[in-house]
C-alpha cells in the first residue's frame, strides 16, 4: 500500500492489555487473540512490526517495598515477567497467522528466546518476521517505556506506538478523577515534559525528543486504532517536534 504513514513501527504493549478481568488471571485468551489480530492488521498492510511488552500483569518492579526486596531484584523479576508475556504473544500470533515470530531477550534465556543482537533483529525485519523484544534492556531501574524508545531508535523504526489500556490518549488531568479533563490531540515533546504529564516515562519522551522519534499514545481497546494511525487518521495523542499543543474536539 502506497498511502501508509509508516513502514516500520515499534508498538509498546502494557502487561495490563493481556490480563484477565480477575485479579488472579494473568492472561485472558480473548485478549490475547484480540491483540494478535490488531497486530496482524498492521502487518498485513506490509508494515514491519517490532513489539515490546511490559510485565505489569505478572509483577511490577515498583512493588519492591511491598515484597520487602531490593528494587534491583524486583526489576529482575519484572524482566522475567516480560519474557513470559512475549512467549504468550508469540503463541497467539502464530496461531492467528503464518508469519514467523521471533522472541528476543536482553538477558540470556536461550532455551526459549534469542539474545537481542541488533544486526540479527534487523535481519529478521528484512525477512518479514515479527519481533517481540523482552527483558527490557537487561538492566534494573529502566522502564519498558524507555526500552521501547531505545529499541525503536536502534532498529530504525519510523515511529513508536504506545498502546494503553482503557485510556484514549494524553489528558491534562486524570480523566478517571476529573470529569473536565481534556484530551490532547497533538503535543510537542517539550509540552509533555514541561506539563509533567505522567502517562509515559519522561526519560523515554526525552530520548525520543533527542532523536526526533514520533510517538502515538492511544487506546488499544479501540478496534483497529493502530491500523488507522498507520493510515494517517488522528487517533489518540500524537507527540513530535513539529506539532503544537492542541486539544481534541
Curated annotation (Swiss-Prot):
Keywords: ATP-binding, Cytoplasm, Kinase, Nucleotide-binding, Pyrimidine biosynthesis, Transferase. Pfam families: AA_kinase. Its EC number is 2.7.4.22. Coiled coil: none annotated. Inhibited by UTP. GO terms for biological process: 'de novo' CTP biosynthetic process; UDP biosynthetic process. GO terms for cellular component: cytoplasm. ATP binds at residues 12-15, 56, 60, 171. It is found in: Cytoplasm. It is an enzyme of class 2 (transferase). It catalyses: UMP + ATP = UDP + ADP. Catalyzes the reversible phosphorylation of UMP to UDP. This is Uridylate kinase. It comes from Orientia tsutsugamushi (strain Boryong).
